[in-house]
């Protein structure tokens, strides 16, 4: 294997030109949980549930143990070949070209299948939070990356952004998520931002927008004071509806670094054998998804430096290696 050649997997056609993650389908055939199944919530409280319905996002405290989150953060630093206590190592040119230009300078870390990432994906509390959101136990986890967002330097051009990963006109049955790997309680240090008011009023708002508007980047004029900067502590999981306009805010702190892992789940597509095999190959060969927002790591470090992640019983099902319905696949 040539370490200078990025190892990626061809995305489905549906994801070639949109930001969404190609390790799962764009929209589930199963509707998000409306509680009509009568099942009790496992992780979310009733207050959490009402907040989710009204605001389009919810924070699950201590979704993974704090120490586990910090271990993952230490790995992200290692993978990026940077030192947390030496700012001189923090800034370097991008290793690969990002087609999705608003992500340039946002700190995306092109690692997808390391053991530390899978440890978080197969944590029971993370899984059960998503079962509350979906109302089904049979889920697949996204194969997604991490983020290391450094303080801006004079002359840096990253201004943050608000977007959708899926066209809201399609009413996607999908959710996304981000796990804090370090405390993000200082609003100046970058991190997740969203506009719940636009989430709530989208159908009315769109009537005032031009027909040829960018379906993925809303004009947020009038919503500037409605931006919510969500505070998280290491180990907290934020889940948000894919209809939620969201993005990364710039890091205006002096020396604080935002570190996160992107994790989401959606109903398993066990009849989609091509996608199931695609996911297994990604895990087994430590290969990144290929898509509009996923350039991969040209160094090939996942393939050359790290072994295949070990999966527990839950992890095997969340990947698709074992089937929820029939045992082993």
Q: Residue spans of the language-model regions?
A:
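Short, conserved beta-strand element in jelly-roll/cupin
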Residues: 167-187, 231-234, 239, 264-267
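Short, solvent-exposed loop/turn segments at secondary-structure junctions
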Residues: 65-67, 147-148, 167, 184-186, ...
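Non-heme Fe(II)/2-oxoglutarate
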Residues: 15, 29-34, 82, 210, ...
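Short, surface-exposed loop/helix-turn segments at secondary-structure junctions
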Residues: 158-163, 211-224, 255-257, 276-282
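Double-stranded beta-helix
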Residues: 184-247
């Amino acid at each position: 294997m040539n370490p200078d050649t990025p190892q990626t997997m061809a995305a489905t056609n549906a994801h070639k030109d949109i930001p969404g993650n190609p390790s799962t389908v764009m929209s589930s055939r199963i509707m998000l949980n409306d509680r009509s199944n009568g099942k009790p919530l496992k992780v979310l409280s009733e207050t959490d549930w009402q907040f989710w319905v009204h605001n389009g996002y919810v924070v699950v405290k201590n979704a993974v143990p704090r120490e586990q989150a910090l271990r993952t953060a230490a790995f992200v630093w290692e993978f990026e070949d940077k030192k947390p206590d030496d700012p001189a190592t923090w800034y370097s040119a991008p290793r690969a070209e990002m087609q999705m230009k608003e992500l340039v300078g946002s700190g995306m870390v092109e690692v997808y299948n390391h053991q530390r990432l899978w440890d978080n994906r197969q944590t029971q509390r993370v899984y059960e939070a998503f079962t509350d959101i979906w109302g089904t136990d049979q889920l697949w986890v996204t194969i997604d990356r991490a983020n290391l967002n450094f303080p801006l330097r004079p002359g840096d051009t990253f201004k943050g952004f608000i977007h959708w990963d899926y066209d809201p006109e399609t009413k996607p049955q999908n959710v996304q998520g981000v796990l804090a790997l370090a405390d993000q309680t200082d609003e100046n240090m970058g991190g997740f931002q969203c506009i719940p008011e636009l989430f709530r009023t989208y159908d009315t708002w769109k009537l005032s927008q031009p027909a040829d508007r960018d379906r993925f980047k809303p004009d947020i004029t009038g919503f500037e004071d409605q931006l919510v900067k969500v505070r998280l502590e290491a180990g907290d999981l934020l889940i948000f509806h894919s209809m939620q306009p969201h993005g990364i805010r710039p890091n205006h702190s002096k020396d604080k670094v935002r570190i996160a892992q992107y994790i989401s789940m959606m109903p398993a597509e066990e009849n989609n054998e091509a996608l199931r095999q695609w996911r297994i190959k990604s895990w087994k060969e430590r290969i990144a998804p290929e898509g509009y927002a996923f350039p991969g790591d040209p160094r090939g470090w996942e393939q050359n430096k790290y072994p295949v992640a070990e999966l527990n019983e839950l992890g095997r099902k969340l990947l698709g290696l074992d089937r929820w319905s029939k045992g082993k696949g």
